C-alpha cells in the first residue's frame, strides 16, 4: 500500500524515498506590507525545509522572498495572488469573464501592535495580517519552538472570517497542513499549496460534477479531467476548481493546472489546495446566501447564455441511428402517435464508417443530408450531431491536419484510457490553442450547420494527447482547459450560423457555464446510475452551471454493456426525473423510443405532455438563472444552508425556485421524503403540508412521483397539447395558482 497518512507524502506528493532533487519551502511571517494602486503587497520570506515526517528549517540555505498581492472587489470578493517565478497578476484568462458588477476597490493599511489591518475606504475590515509572537508559558525545552508562519485572516464581504491554516500541526515539526508553501524539483519551482482553516461542523459542496454525497467534507479530490466511465466512481468529466462552504463563503482557484483539493480530508482542521503549477491565484467569495456566492463566482467567470426554446423539449437518440430512412420512420411514428419531441440526435452512425469522425455524412445511408434535415425541420424536429475533437489515423482530414499543425504533433505514440468503443487510432488532438486550427475546426462544423444542423454534440474533450506539442500551452495546463476552448469554438460557430448558442457537452472546466449545455456522461441504466447522476447534477449546479441533463434512462446496461434490457421501472422513473430537469434527452446503447416499452408507453407519453406543459415555467426560471447565481436543478442547501439535514440530502432537489422534487429510485416504489421549512402543496393531488418534516416510507405508484410546489406560487404552464415547441405561442401561457382552491395538476 502506498498511502502513509502523512501530509508530506500523501498530500504534497513527495516521494517517500525523499529524493534529493526535491525541496519544500514554507512561508514565514511577512517582513513588509505596503499599498500600491489600491492593492496590498506583502513581502513573504520562504524557508527551505529538511524533508522528513518531522520537518525542520534548513537554515544553511538562504530564504527566498516572494510578493503576495491582496486585491479587493466591491461585491465581497478578496483575491490572493502569489506567483513563484515570472508570474504577474492579470485578468486576461480564458477562465475569467468579469461582469460589470466586478469593480476593484482600494485597500488601506492600518498598523496595530503585531498586526496589519486592511480595510476599504468605508472602514470595513477585509483582512488582518498577524505577525504577533504566539503567547507562551515556557516550562519545557523538550520540543523546538514552532517555525514562523503566515497568519492572515480574510473578511471578503466584511462579515465572513476565513483564516489561513497557520498552525495545523501536532508537535511543531509534524505538519498536517501549511498555510502557503511551494516545492522545487531540480531547482525548478513546480508546485504550490495554500490552506484555510475549517471548523469541526463545516460542510462543503461543488467542485464540479461530483458523483458523491452532498457534504464533501472528509474527501480529497484530484482536479484532473478524465473520462468518467460512469457516474459511480471518483473519476469525473467535469472538475471545477471551486467549492462552497456552509460558513457562507466560496473559493475559486483560478488555475487550469492539475490540482488536488482536500476538504478536511487529510486534516480535519484544514481545506488544502495543491497545484502542479507554482502559482496561487485565489478568489474568496463571501455572501449572505448561497445564491450570492454562486453569483459572485459567475461575476468572475461568466454567466450562462439562454438556450433556445426548442432545446427544452424532448430529445430522442440512441447509439446509434444508421440511416435517414430509419430516422424518418421513427420521427413519423412520434408524430403519428403524438409523442411530443423537438430534437433527433444522430450519434456515431452518420459517417461513412461508424465512429470514424470526418464531419461528413455517409453518402449511401444519408444520400441527401440537406433535404433530410430540411424535411425533419418542416416536421418540427431539429437535428443534433455527434463528433469529437480528435482526428483518426485513417480520417479523410488527417494529412491536412498534420501538414498544418491543426492537430498537435505527437512526440511518442500513446494508448488511450478513455471510453473509445470503436478501437480507432486517434492520431492527434485538435489544437485549440492555435487560432488557425480553431478556424479550421469551425469550418468543418459550418458546412454541417449550413445544411440545417442545429446542435453539435461536443463529446469527449476530457483527455488530450499529453505527449504532444501544442502551440499555445503545455499539455499539463491544457488538459483541464481544453474543454473550455473546444466548447467555445463549437458554440461560437453554431451561434454565428444558426442564431442559437448551444452545444451538448460532456467535459467542463471553470468558464464552461458560458456555453450551455452539459450532460452527465455515461451512466448505467440502473438505480445506482440514476442516483449517481442526480448527485453529480446537484454538485454541478453548485459549481456555477445553470443547465444540465443526463441520458434517460441511463447510457449503458449491465451485465452486458450494450445489450442487456433496461427495466420498465428504471425507464419510467428516469423519465420522471428527466421531466423535472432543465433538459431531457433519451440516449443509450440500445433502443430508447418509448414504444419499445409497451407496458409503460402510455405513461411515458403522459409525462412528456406534462413536460411540454411546464416549458413556460422552465423558460421563466431559465431567464432568472442566466441573470443570477441559480441553476435549474438546485440542491436543498441553496435555499436552506442553515438546515444541517439538507447538507446530507442528495436524492431530492428544487426544480427552479418553486418545485421540490423527490425521485423514486428503487423497485419497491417507496422512499422517505424531507420537506424543508415552508408550506408545501402536492403538485398532483393538492394535499397541503408544512415543513420542516419527514414523510417516512411513502408508497409511490409507478405512474406518480413526489413533487411539491410552494404554497401560493404562480406557475406558468402551457394549456394546449403540442407535438413540438414550434407549435407553441408562449403568450398563450396560463397562470397555475397554487392557492387554497388548487386540487392538483391532473384534476384542474
Regions found by a protein language model. Name each.
Residues 56-57, 67-68, 228-231, 238-240, ...:
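Generic recognition of flexible, low-complexity loop/linker segments
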Residues 63, 235-236, 244, 273-275, ...:
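Active-site-proximal structural scaffolding
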Residues 70, 124-125, 242, 334, ...:
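Conserved structural-core and active-site-/substrate-pathway-adjacent residues in large, well-folded domains
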Residues 78, 107, 669-671:
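Short beta-strand/loop motifs in extracellular/secreted proteins, especially
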Residues 491-496, 500-501, 508-519, 529-532, ...:
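Catalytic core of carbohydrate-active enzymes
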Amino acid at each position: 500500500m502506498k498511502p502513509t497518512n502523512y501530509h508530506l507524502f500523501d498530500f504534497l506528493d513527495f516521494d517517500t524515498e525523499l529524493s534529493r532533487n526535491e525541496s519544500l519551502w514554507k512561508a514565514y511571517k511577512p517582513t513588509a506590507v505596503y499599498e500600491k494602486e489600491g492593492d496590498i503587497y506583502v513581502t513573504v520570506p520562504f524557508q527551505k525545509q529538511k524533508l522528513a515526517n518531522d520537518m525542520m528549517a534548513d537554515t544553511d540555505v538562504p530564504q527566498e522572498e516572494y510578493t503576495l498581492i491582496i486585491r479587493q472587489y466591491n461585491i465581497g470578493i478578496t483575491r490572493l495572488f502569489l506567483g513563484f517565478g515570472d508570474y504577474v497578476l492579470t485578468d486576461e484568462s480564458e477562465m475569467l469573464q468579469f461582469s460589470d458588477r466586478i469593480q476593484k476597490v482600494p485597500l488601506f493599511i492600518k498598523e496595530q501592535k503585531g498586526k496589519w489591518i486592511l480595510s476599504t475606504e468605508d472602514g470595513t475590515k477585509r483582512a488582518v495580517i498577524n505577525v504577533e509572537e504566539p503567547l507562551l508559558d515556557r516550562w519545557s525545552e523538550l520540543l523546538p519552538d514552532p517555525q514562523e508562519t503566515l497568519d492572515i485572516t480574510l473578511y471578503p464581504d466584511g462579515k465572513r472570517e476565513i483564516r489561513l491554516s497557520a498552525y495545523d500541526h501536532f508537535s511543531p515539526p509534524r505538519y498536517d497542513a501549511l498555510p502557503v508553501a511551494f516545492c522545487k524539483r531540480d531547482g525548478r519551482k513546480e508546485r504550490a499549496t495554500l490552506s484555510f482553516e475549517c471548523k469541526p461542523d463545516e460542510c462543503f459542496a461543488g467542485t464540479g460534477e461530483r458523483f458523491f454525497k452532498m457534504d464533501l467534507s472528509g474527501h480529497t479530490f484530484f482536479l484532473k479531467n478524465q473520462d468518467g466511465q460512469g457516474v459511480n466512481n471518483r473519476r469525473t468529466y467535469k472538475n471545477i476548481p471551486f467549492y462552497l462552504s456552509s460558513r457562507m463563503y466560496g473559493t475559486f482557484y483560478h488555475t487550469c493546472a492539475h490540482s488536488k483539493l482536500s476538504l478536511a480530508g487529510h486534516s480535519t482542521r484544514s481545506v488544502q489546495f495543491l497545484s502542479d503549477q507554482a502559482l496561487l491565484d485565489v478568489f474568496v467569495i463571501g455572501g449572505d446566501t448561497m445564491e450570492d456566492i454562486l453569483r459572485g463566482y459567475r461575476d468572475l467567470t461568466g454567466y450562462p447564455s439562454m438556450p433556445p426554446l426548442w432545446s427544452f423539449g424532448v430529445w430522442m437518440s440512441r447509439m446509434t441511428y444508421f440511416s435517414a430512412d430509419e430516422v424518418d420512420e421513427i420521427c413519423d411514428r412520434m408524430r403519428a402517435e403524438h409523442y411530443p419531441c423537438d430534437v433527433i440526435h444522430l450519434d456515431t452512425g452518420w459517417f461513412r464508417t461508424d465512429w470514424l469522425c470526418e464531419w461528413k455524412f455517409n453518402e449511401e445511408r444519408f444520400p441527401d443530408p440537406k433535404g433530410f434535415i430540411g424535411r425533419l425541420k418542416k416536421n418540427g424536429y431539429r437535428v443534433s450531431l455527434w463528433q469529437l475533437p480528435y482526428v483518426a489515423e485513417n480520417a479523410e482530414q488527417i494529412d491536412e491536419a498534420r501538414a498544418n499543425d491543426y492537430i498537435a504533433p505527437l512526440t511518442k505514440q500513446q494508448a488511450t484510457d478513455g471510453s473509445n468503443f470503436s478501437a480507432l487510432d486517434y492520431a492527434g488532438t485538435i489544437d485549440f490553442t492555435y487560432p488557425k486550427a480553431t478556424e479550421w475546426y469551425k469550418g468543418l462544423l459550418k458546412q454541417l450547420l449550413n445544411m440545417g444542423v442545429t446542435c453539435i454534440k461536443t463529446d469527449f474533450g476530457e483527455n488530450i494527447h499529453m505527449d504532444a506539442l501544442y502551440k499555445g500551452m503545455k499539455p499539463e495546463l491544457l488538459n483541464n482547459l481544453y474543454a473550455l476552448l473546444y466548447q467555445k469554438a463549437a458554440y461560437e460557430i453554431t451561434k454565428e450560423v444558426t442564431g442559437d448558442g448551444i452545444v451538448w457537452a460532456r467535459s467542463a472546466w471553470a468558464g464552461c457555464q458560458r456555453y450551455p449545455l452539459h450532460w452527465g456522461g455515461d451512466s448505467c441504466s440502473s438505480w445506482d446510475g440514476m442516483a449517481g447522476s442526480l448527485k453529480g447534477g446537484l454538485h454541478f449546479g453548485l459549481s456555477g452551471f445553470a443547465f444540465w441533463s443526463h441520458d434517460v434512462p441511463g447510457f449503458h446496461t449491465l451485465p452486458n454493456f450494450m445489450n442487456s434490457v433496461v427495466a420498465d421501472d428504471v425507464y419510467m422513473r428516469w423519465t420522471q426525473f428527466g421531466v423535472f430537469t432543465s433538459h431531457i434527452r433519451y440516449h443509450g446503447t440500445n433502443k430508447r423510443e418509448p414504444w419499445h416499452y409497451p407496458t409503460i408507453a402510455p405513461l411515458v407519453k403522459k409525462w412528456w405532455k406534462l413536460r411540454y406543459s411546464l416549458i413556460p415555467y422552465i423558460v421563466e426560471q431559465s431567464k432568472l438563472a442566466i441573470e443570477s447565481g441559480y441553476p435549474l436543478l438546485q440542491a436543498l442547501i441553496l435555499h436552506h444552508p442553515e438546515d444541517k439535514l439538507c447538507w446530507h440530502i442528495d436524492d431530492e432537489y428544487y426544480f427552479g425556485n418553486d418545485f421540490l422534487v423527490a425521485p423514486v429510485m428503487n423497485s419497491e416504489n417507496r422512499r422517505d421524503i424531507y420537506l424543508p421549512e415552508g408550506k408545501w402543496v402536492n403538485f398532483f393531488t393538492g394535499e397541503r403540508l408544512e415543513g420542516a418534516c419527514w414523510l417516512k416510507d411513502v408508497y409511490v405508484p409507478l405512474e406518480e412521483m413526489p413533487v411539491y410546489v410552494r404554497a401560493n406560487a404562480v406557475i406558468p404552464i402551457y394549456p394546449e397539447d403540442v407535438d413540438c415547441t414550434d407549435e407553441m405561442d408562449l403568450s398563450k401561457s396560463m397562470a397555475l395558482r397554487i392557492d387554497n382552491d388548487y386540487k392538483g395538476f391532473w384534476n384542474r
